[in-house]
């Protein structure tokens, strides 16, 4: 089934609404501050959209560099325009349904892997394999931080979330509950896994790749 985010009209409609999503900026602020222990350094933004989150991270940690990946032509046009004069940013086309690359600009570890409102578009099996790939790309001590839509515990809470968002359900959504996702992050090898901020179905999930312990 083709990925619906290649549809230019759908992507442009999302971009027109995305800056007004309730409490998004609050969650982004918590995410940016959570990276203080691992940046400046190399950042990978998964499903970067128009580059909004990368721009916030680079504003806070200006000595960092970033690779932004997305598969939507409209999103790639928007992020390319945003960073046209910023040589700290590399932009690449990649579908999160496919395994993350480990060659070219991806052949060195990242200090942080970030994502916002993207990973919920892949199914649960792919989420789990993606988390393992993220851990493999992180340097020891690196952080994965994901500001994500999670499945609400009840339909009533889900309906209220959608009402406050002013949006309908998207057939491309593959929402998973928060608690299993925290477990998948631990299973992938991350430590200090937690949900460190949440507003209704919008949750900030994070974990740190452990550093090697002392040799015996």
Q: Where do the language-model regions lie?
A:
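Class I SAM-dependent methyltransferase SAM/SAH-binding core
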Residues: 44, 50-99
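A short His-aromatic
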Residues: 120-122
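Conserved class I S-adenosyl-L-methionine
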Residues: 1-38
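Short conserved loop adjoining the S-adenosyl-L-methionine
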Residues: 98-107
């Amino acid at each position: 089934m083709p990925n619906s985010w290649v549809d230019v009209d759908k992507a442009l409609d999302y971009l027109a609404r995305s800056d007004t999503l309730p409490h998004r900026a609050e969650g982004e602020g918590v995410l940016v501050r959570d990276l203080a222990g691992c940046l400046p350094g190399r950042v990978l933004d998964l499903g970067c959209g128009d580059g909004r989150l990368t721009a916030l991270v680079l504003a806070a940690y200006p000595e960092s560099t970033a690779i932004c990946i997305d598969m939507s032509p409209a999103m790639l046009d928007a992020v390319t325009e945003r960073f046209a004069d910023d040589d700290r940013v590399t932009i690449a086309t990649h579908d999160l349904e496919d395994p993350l690359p480990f060659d070219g600009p991806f052949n060195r570890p990242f200090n942080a892997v970030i994502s916002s409102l993207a990973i919920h578009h892949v199914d649960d099996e792919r989420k789990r394999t993606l988390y393992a790939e993220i851990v493999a790309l992180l340097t020891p001590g690196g952080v994965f931080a994901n500001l994500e839509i999670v499945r609400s515990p009840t339909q009533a809470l889900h309906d209220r979330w959608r009402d406050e968002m002013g949006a309908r359900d998207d057939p491309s959504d593959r929402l998973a509950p928060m608690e299993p996702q925290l477990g998948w992050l631990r299973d992938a090898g991350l430590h200090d896994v937690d949900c460190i901020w949440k507003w209704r179905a919008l949750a900030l999930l994070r974990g740190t790749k452990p550093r090697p312990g002392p040799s015996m």
